């Protein structure tokens, strides 16, 4: 059977994917590996038969797809978060990498390890394939006979790096009794249930209807003006506020109650038997996706947005809230204009299923081209961001841009998740089989255990430092700190595990923030480590 798989790489690929994804769904003590199980299945299969190898282009494309859509998702928040605390994470990442290089140097020197294999161990402990490749290229220019040795150290440390980081994330979450959804809610990534209530404005409240969130100091939105119990009209943000005006406001219950205290007094309001109705529609129009609420000028189209459901979270719309494909929008509209609003927003499942792959192809092309640009280093060598670093930077930038002319860079939620999972699985299957030969050869040497243990020490030090400093110095939530740990390794398997366990995007935020710095830092750091040895 193994010989058959070795002769048929395509069949080997789908078998590894099927078995790995099936094992990944098995839960033990409430934990599961998810797509990360594909890596371990690939490693076992290729160790059993070293001729089973998935072509390199498969996992290069898989990694590029995965990190690109991660960048797209994180892009809108990345630059605003960077201004707040992302720069702190970048400085922390540089200091962490310097510390880990120092730790690796001490381990290699004190244990008398081979310099080339030890440097490979360092790259494997941080699962840096580009870093390992850079060291191989560096050694080829010094002593070509040693060029294969970093691959051995990398192969020995890699499995422990993935498993070690996952164990820290799992055990830490259990010991600290982490409430993943509550942490994400406190960070504004999951909102509390939304409600609506009536309010009559007190004297002295002046301005426009659109000023009410600022005047109340709360994240709310006024959707209706109540002229009498049976006559409601859209709360046009540009309408001037009049004394005693009665409105319907939406937001979380806490925000709405605080807003009512600040603005006036609560009024019992019924929405039945009025000229306006609520209905929920799905965004599928390319003219709408990627635009902000303010850009849509909804009142001119006969409706107001009361709530936006993005993924599993409902948010109160603000003027700068970006509307994305597959967002489900609760609108206030006159019954006679529902069809018009439906045409404007799209509301077509078929359109969402017919994903426009042109922006994806262009974005990936830009990312791969960026990753291929050689960056000169001291000593005449060069480095590049590679097929992981280039696409995630392109994704972050294009995700923040949202759209360029007729091109909408954002993708429907389901398409984004599908491409992400597929790309991750392809990458893990490929990189797992590529490590099998070196891993099998090294297992026959008893000294390989030292390299495995040394790599695990570096991995655990990295994850624990991210946890301790991230939570108690940088004031990150546990999931975001573990996202930073995953970003330090730039390993998709770890972030996939975190996403599966937490059910939120908090880990993704930390991952995307430090990924570019970690990617470049490890490429440089691995070469510096070898030269220091």
Swiss-Prot record:
Bilayer topology term: Multi-pass membrane protein
GO molecular function: monoatomic cation transmembrane transporter activity
Keyword Transmembrane helix: yes
Entry's Gene Ontology BP terms: potassium ion transport
Superkingdom: Bacteria
GO CC annotation terms, alphabetical: plasma membrane
Keyword line: Cell membrane, Membrane, Transmembrane, Transmembrane helix, Transport
SUPFAM superfamilies: TrkA C-terminal domain-like
Transmembrane stretches, start-end: 4-23, 28-47, 57-79, 86-108, 151-173, 352-374, 379-401, 422-444, 454-476
Location in the cell: Cell membrane
Keyword Transcription belongs to the record: no
Domain RCK C-terminal: 263-347
Family membership noted in the UniProt record: Belongs to the AAE transporter (TC 2.A.81) family.
Annotated protein name in UniProt: Uncharacterized transporter Cgl0590/cg0683
